[in-house]
Amino acid sequence: MILRLSSVLLFSCLLVVSNARVLNNAQLKPVPVSNAFDPECNMDVPEIINRWGYPAEEISVVTEDNYILTMHRIPYGRDGPSPNRPVIFLQHGLEDSRFIFADAGFDVYLGNMRGNLYSRDHTRLDPKSHEFWDFSFDEMVKYDLDAQVNEALKRSNQSSLYYVGHSQGTLTMFSKLSRDPIFHRKVEFRHQKVLCVGASTVKHIKGMLQVLAEFLFDEVKFFYWLFGDGEFIPTNKLFNLIAEYVCESKQGTAFCDNLLTLIMGVDSNQINATRNDVYFTHIPAGTSTKNVIHWASVLNVQMVRSGILREYDYGWSNEKYYGRNEPPVYDVSQDQCEIYLFWCPDDWLADEADIEGYLIPALKKQYVVKNTKLEDFNHIDFLWGMRAADEVYKPILDAITDDLKKQTNPLD
């Protein structure tokens, strides 16, 4: 279904409402930028990687339910190829971290879940069909992680890897480890680590998405009517127009900064505003309306209202899908691997109340090796923030390096 004009108008109205509601929490202000066009606006991921002097590969993998996913790989850094490079799997992106890890000697894989701009194909279904988009992050947990991790290990001839997740990439791994012991054993090694940034439940979300939840999400049918039952806000529609005609101009920079603030959290002054046009031409990366409903919690028993991480709620049809009235819960207390958490109080999509009130108490204490609370970060700063390299990526690299040393010298 084509994005309805009413949904665009409603999006604009909600932006105004959100702006008014969060002004007490965030000062929205313009940042001077250059009008120069950045060529990365029209590049795909491999082209951007090549532009910075790194090799890039595209790898297709078919899931058990026949979705065709595309991973991106940086097999080595500027030092050139070498054998037996440890594998690190990034879900999703984490911007410049891919180059930091490649230069540090890692074989870097960038995952793309179904519905993402690079993972919208199927052996049988037409990507334009409603059937193709009939998924939420449940299917990513069940099928996509298996397919991508297995392929990365196979290609690199390794038996284990390091996983670094952000946002949905963290939530899906937590869910996978809680549910699938075979997968857990498959990737487990003596010092297994999952390094996670910016994710939890979304009961205490703030900003524009909170407004959407309050105003729209009591009626599933209305939400589907508004946005369709296929792809949620196609990537090359609204946001590309904003990037092309607004973010490049000095006058429009404030609008783009404010839009990020209203969604992601208080402006931390970490974003390089000269790259706003690049950021907005590559977001949103694409997903289904059903996945947004799962995240935003349309039904009263979904995550926003309950604060519990569970599978998609089909309402009266739960009995049909699950054989029970309530959807199954992802019990993260079953996760049994070393976990390194990086989070921040100003992240409106992974709120402090959700992190400290649900996630940390739910995880077993012996597995939470490091719990890092960052100040003056918001949700998007983990990817694009100018302090992310020093305060997030390098500590992650240090943790992995220490682990590799312990594997080489088990008595250390």
Describe the residue ranges of each PLM region.
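Short beta-strand/loop motif that positions the catalytic acidic residue
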Residues: 335, 341-343, 347
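Alpha/beta-hydrolase active-site loop
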Residues: 130-155
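Alpha/beta-hydrolase-fold enzymes
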Residues: 21-24, 154-159, 170-314, 319
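Cleavable N-terminal signal peptides of Sec/SRP-targeted secreted and luminal proteins
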Residues: 2-20
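Conserved alpha/beta-hydrolase "acid-adjacent" motif
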Residues: 348-354
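Short, surface-exposed "cap/lid" segments of acyl-processing enzymes
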Residues: 48, 63, 68-125
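Gly/Ala-rich beta-loop-alpha elbow adjacent to hydrolase catalytic centers
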Residues: 164-169
